[in-house]
């Protein structure tokens, strides 16, 4: 009997002792980089959802090694961040100690699953030797003007005691913990991601990524073409610009709206409206951007008392303020055309503002008309369709110095400051004379000091502000300064970790350029779709900055991306609070790591979300036990069943073996593991029915199954008499000629009625088929006492005997 507990331990020990999965560097071989999104090492450890993506990259890595590639398949830890700090605050433990313990537990769990990681390349984002280079990248951005300080409206979470980025807010609450978010102005470090908006957008087209992820990034970047139009404020020298994607509707403007926080609001509000305006601003000042836009179902606003002049026809239109206009998007002002915009229509209807039709079509009594149509009431645009009218209006605006063609983006610069302890220190010093300087490169890493009190201060400072010995500095000229006390967000270290795996022990540079050239871009990156507009966008941005600096040789980091689905329990996401977490350690103890790996790959398509079945691993174990019994003599576990596995080939399994090698290889490459495993089951069914199994096919099959069930296949490989690991045994090939049936079934009819059938070699001669048909006992019965008048032979199909 196969004992998974002893066999799995044996091979895990063997792989570790022999450095089996050390990254190859044979210059004659091609290179393949298979990457997992590295985990945050939480105290909860792994649940069965984690190994799904990890098993997929492991199968590919193992196949590529067997196909003769140098394979880079590393693992590391996204170790900084809020969850560890929250846990440390709750328990009073040191976050560094907590992190180390969690990593040790995660690593033990991963090794029990038999993943073929090169542990020599392990990285941890909270290790000073690692974050030295995170800080170095920040310094290069600072020198290029891509990292800057600004007083900006931020998403402040009092419960977390820190700012969170737009990308970290889900449905108006913090993604981590689901806490409310409020708007406030704070001094923050920003990274100028907007400088890369066009490239981040355009280069998506070259990537082999799931279309929904690319679409989410396109929408997040939100490029829109239109015009910037200048409105003058009546009886004033003030002006304001609006960005619009519909300059063709300028004749239909019936009011304008400013962002409540716009400085202009205070300057133009009339005395009669001042109280109402101030009251409104106070009411909405703590709302987050999302609450004001996407989640804002009810339109609110106040008239300022001021009017603006429409530049195209000189008409006066009222100036309102409303929370749906953001100071941070576009120009912080909009022109409203209620007849042809749904949001403007709702606002105008609520506040009784005019609705001026300028395009034919629709019923304005019921709703805005947003489609294409002929322009009316629009002077020189009358009769034109939307696109022609847009072009003509932009020409008019430019000719009259009233506006210009403009491209706008929804993307904002990245808010890079966190008011927390457990993150990378920002290597900046603020001097008493008002200047700012970087910590010299040769003094990096700027280490995170040990602190016993890491409670958030509730102010724009992090707990580091309390460590005065660390904060206060004096330069050689006696000038006093203070270190930056905000830390970087946990997205910083994960924005470039895939580069460090390539050269993890380099203390002279982030990574050697020639090595980066050899391995980049990452060939396959597997992880959750929830990272579409955070990690994946941030990493692309950092990579492009590093490309411009000449640090990396490619424009993009990840050539092929794949999102695995969720493994659910009782149709819900697994979580401790729901009590529905399945621990992989328990499954491994009972059924073995190979059974768990195989079940997770066999559940369904890799990108589908599927419900966990507690009996699933038992069924894959049953299949693996069948494989074991077929190839290993149960009485002598070191021998093969000689009478079944032979050196001769009678051809019986030729076709199914060729089909299996072809399908498994192609399906693995396409990440269709469930159908590859189905085909292996087809082969085993055929092999069990066959009189004998050619040794070549038995060994070939073991190589095919090894990436999925590596422990058992290593053991069988050894039973077959091989001394070395199966990991580098050459991947099987097949003879395409054998995909075609070598035998066919011939139907035999007597006077048009089916009376028998037999197997014959494909394309047998007509006379041979006739002879065989006439000799069949069952056919003879129907020919008794009759004369055969004629025999019609259709090769490979039918022999029809006419007898009277």
From Swiss-Prot:
An example Gene Ontology molecular-function term: ATP binding
SUPFAM superfamilies: Anticodon-binding domain of a subclass of class I aminoacyl-tRNA synthetases (SSF47323), Nucleotidylyl transferase (SSF52374), ValRS/IleRS/LeuRS editing domain (SSF50677)
Protein name: Leucine--tRNA ligase
'HIGH' region, short sequence motif: residues: 39-50
Subcellular localization, as worded in the UniProt entry: Cytoplasm
PANTHER family in the record: LEUCINE--TRNA LIGASE, MITOCHONDRIAL, LEUCYL-TRNA SYNTHETASE
Record keywords, A-Z: Aminoacyl-tRNA synthetase, ATP-binding, Cytoplasm, Ligase, Nucleotide-binding, Protein biosynthesis
Major subcellular location class: cytoplasm
Top-level taxonomy: Bacteria, Bacillati, Bacillota, Bacilli, Lactobacillales
Catalytic activity: tRNA(Leu) + L-leucine + ATP = L-leucyl-tRNA(Leu) + AMP + diphosphate
Classification via InterPro entries: aa-tRNA-synth_I_CS, aa-tRNA-synth_Ia, Leu-tRNA-ligase, Leu_tRNA-synth_edit, M/V/L/I-tRNA-synth_anticd-bd, Methionyl/Leucyl_tRNA_Synth, Rossmann-like_a/b/a_fold, tRNAsynth_Ia_anticodon-bd
EC number: 6.1.1.4
Disulfide bonds: none
UniProt-annotated binding residues for ATP: 576
């Amino acid at each position: 009997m196969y004992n998974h507990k002893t066999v799995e331990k044996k091979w895990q020990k063997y792989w570790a002792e022999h450095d089996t999965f050390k990254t190859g560097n044979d210059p004659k071989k091609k290179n393949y980089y298979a990457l997992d999104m590295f985990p945050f090492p939480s105290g909860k450890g792994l649940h069965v959802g984690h190994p799904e993506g990890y098993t997929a990259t492991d199968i590919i890595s193992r196949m590529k090694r067997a196909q003769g590639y140098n394979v880079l398949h590393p693992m590391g830890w996204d170790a900084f961040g809020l969850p560890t700090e929250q846990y440390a605050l709750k328990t009073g433990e040191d976050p560094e100690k907590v992190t180390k313990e969690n990593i040790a537990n995660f690593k033990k769990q991963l090794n029990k699953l038999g993943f073929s990681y090169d542990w020599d390349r392990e990285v941890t984002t909270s290790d000073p030797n690692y974050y030295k280079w995170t800080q170095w990248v920040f310094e290069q951005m600072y020198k290029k003007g891509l990292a800057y300080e600004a007083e900006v409206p931020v998403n402040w979470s009092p419960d977390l005691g820190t700012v969170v980025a737009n990308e970290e807010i889900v449905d108006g609450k913090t993604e981590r913990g689901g806490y409310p978010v409020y708007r406030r102005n704070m001094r923050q470090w920003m990274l100028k991601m907007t400088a890369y908006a066009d490239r981040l957008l355009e280069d998506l087209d070259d990537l082999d990524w799931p279309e929904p992820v690319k679409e989410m990034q396109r929408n997040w970047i939100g490029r829109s073409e239109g015009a910037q139009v200048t409105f003058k404020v009546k009886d004033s020298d003030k002006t304001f610009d609006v960005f619009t994607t519909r300059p063709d509707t300028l004749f239909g403007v019936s009011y304008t709206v400013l962002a409540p926080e716009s400085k202009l609001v205070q300057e133009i509000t009339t005395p009669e409206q001042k109280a109402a305006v101030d009251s409104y601003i106070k009411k909405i000042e703590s709302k987050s951007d999302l609450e004001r836009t996407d989640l804002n179902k009810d339109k609110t606003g106040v008239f300022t008392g001021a009017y603006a002049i429409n530049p195209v026809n000189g008409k006066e239109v009222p100036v309102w303020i409303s929370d749906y206009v953001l100071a941070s998007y576009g120009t912080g002002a909009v022109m409203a055309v209620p007849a042809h915009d749904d949001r403007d229509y709702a606002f105008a209807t609520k506040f009784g503002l005019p609705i001026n039709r300028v395009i034919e079509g629709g019923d304005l009594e019921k709703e805005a008309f947003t489609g294409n149509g002929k322009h009316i009431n629009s002077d020189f645009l009358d009769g034109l369709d939307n696109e022609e009218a847009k072009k003509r209006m932009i020409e008019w605006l430019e000719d009259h110095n009233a506006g210009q063609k403009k491209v706008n983006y929804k993307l904002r610069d990245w808010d890079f400051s966190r008011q927390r302890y457990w993150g990378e220190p920002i290597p900046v010093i603020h001097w008493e004379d008002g200047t700012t300087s970087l910590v010299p490169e040769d003094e990096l890493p700027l280490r995170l000091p040990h602190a016993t009190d890491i409670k958030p201060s509730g102010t724009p400072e992090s707990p580091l502000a309390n460590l005065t010995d660390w904060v206060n500095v004096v330069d050689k000229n006696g000038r006093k300064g203070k270190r930056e006390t905000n830390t970087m967000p946990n997205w910083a270290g994960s924005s470039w970790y895939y580069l460090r795996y390539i050269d993890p022990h380099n203390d002279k540079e982030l990574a050697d350029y020639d090595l980066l050239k050899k391995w980049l871009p990452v060939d396959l990156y597997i992880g959750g779709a929830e990272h579409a507009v955070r990690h994946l966008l941030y990493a692309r941005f950092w990579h492009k900055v590093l490309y411009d600096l000449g640090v990396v040789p490619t424009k993009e980091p990840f050539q092929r991306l794949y999102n695995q689905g969720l493994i659910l329990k009782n149709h819900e996401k697994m979580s401790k609070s729901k009590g529905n977490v399945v621990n992989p350690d328990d499954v491994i103890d009972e059924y073995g790591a190979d059974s768990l790996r195989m079940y997770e790959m066999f559940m369904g398509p890799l990108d589908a979300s599927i419900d966990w079945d507690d009996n699933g691993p038992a069924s894959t174990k049953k299949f693996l036990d069948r494989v074991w019994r077929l190839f290993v003599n149960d009485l002598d576990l070191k021998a093969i069943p000689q009478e079944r596995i032979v050196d001769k080939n009678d051809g019986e399994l030729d076709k199914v073996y060729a089909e299996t090698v072809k399908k498994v290889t192609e399906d693995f490459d396409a990440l269709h593991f469930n159908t590859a495993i189905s085909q292996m089951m087809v082969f085993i069914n055929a092999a069990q029915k066959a009189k004998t199994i050619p040794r070549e096919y038995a060994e070939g099959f073991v190589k095919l199954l090894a990436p999925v069930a590596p422990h058992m296949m290593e053991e069988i490989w050894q039973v077959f008499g091989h001394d070395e690991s199966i990991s580098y045994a050459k991947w099987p090939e097949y003879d395409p000629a054998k995909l075609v049936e070598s035998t066919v079934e011939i139907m035999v009819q007597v006077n048009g009625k089916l009376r028998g059938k037999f197997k014959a070699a494909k394309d047998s001669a007509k006379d041979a088929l006739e002879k065989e048909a006439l000799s069949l006992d069952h056919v003879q019965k129907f020919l008794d006492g009759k004369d055969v008048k004629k025999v019609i032979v259709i090769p490979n199909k039918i022999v029809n005997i006419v007898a009277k």
